[in-house]
């Protein structure tokens, strides 16, 4: 399976749940609760990635990153943003990778 294929497949399952709700589906639960619940889950899972990173447990970190990706895909779908939109933006950024940007603020000052 192509590395991008799994993300597309998951995105399509999420979209299908939105359009064809299945009783008891966690994805449907998120869509029913709306943007605040989805954003809360994205925030919670992102925090768990940070904690798992500090704990130095690769398996936990991978699991938490998968949770962030899943909830982010739900958010994208909720906002009607297609994976292709994200891919296009990443491609544009990749094309600029060798171009130096104007002075950036140091990370510690953000």
UniProtKB/Swiss-Prot annotation:
Top-rank EC class of the record's enzyme: hydrolase
Q: Keyword Plastid, does the record have it?
A: no
Pfam families from the UniProt entry: PRA-PH (PF01503)
Family affiliation: Belongs to the PRA-PH family.
Q: Would the keyword Transferase be found if you checked this record's keyword annotation?
A: no
> What are the UniProt keywords, alphabetically?
Amino-acid biosynthesis, ATP-binding, Cytoplasm, Histidine biosynthesis, Hydrolase, Nucleotide-binding
Q: Name one GO molecular function term.
A: ATP binding
Question: Which pathway does this polypeptide act in?
Answer: Amino-acid biosynthesis; L-histidine biosynthesis; L-histidine from 5-phospho-alpha-D-ribose 1-diphosphate: step 2/9
Location within or outside the cell: Cytoplasm
InterPro entries, per this entry?
HisE (IPR008179), PRib-ATP_PPHydrolase-like (IPR021130)
| Disulfide bonds, paired cysteine numbers | none
Main subcellular location:
cytoplasm
Query: Could you name the Gene Ontology cellular component terms for this entry?
Result: cytoplasm
Tell me the HAMAP family matching this sequence.
HisE
The protein's gene is named: hisE
EC id: 3.6.1.31
GO BP terms, alphabetized:
L-histidine biosynthetic process
Name of the protein in question: Phosphoribosyl-ATP pyrophosphatase
Q: Which reaction does it catalyse?
A: 1-(5-phospho-beta-D-ribosyl)-ATP + H2O = 1-(5-phospho-beta-D-ribosyl)-5'-AMP + diphosphate + H(+)
């Amino acid at each position: 399976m192509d590395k991008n294929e799994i993300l597309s497949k998951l995105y399509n399952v999420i979209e299908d749940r939105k359009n064809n709700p299945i009783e008891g589906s966690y994805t449907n639960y998120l869509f029913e609760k709306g943007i605040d619940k989805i954003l809360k889950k994205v925030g919670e899972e992102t925090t768990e990635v940070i904690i798992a990173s500090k704990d130095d447990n690769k398996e936990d970190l991978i699991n938490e990153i998968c949770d962030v990706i899943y909830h982010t895909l739900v958010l994208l779908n909720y906002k009607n943003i297609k994976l292709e939109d994200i891919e296009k933006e990443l491609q544009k950024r990749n094309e600029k990778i060798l171009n130096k940007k104007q002075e950036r603020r140091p990370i510690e000052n953000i």
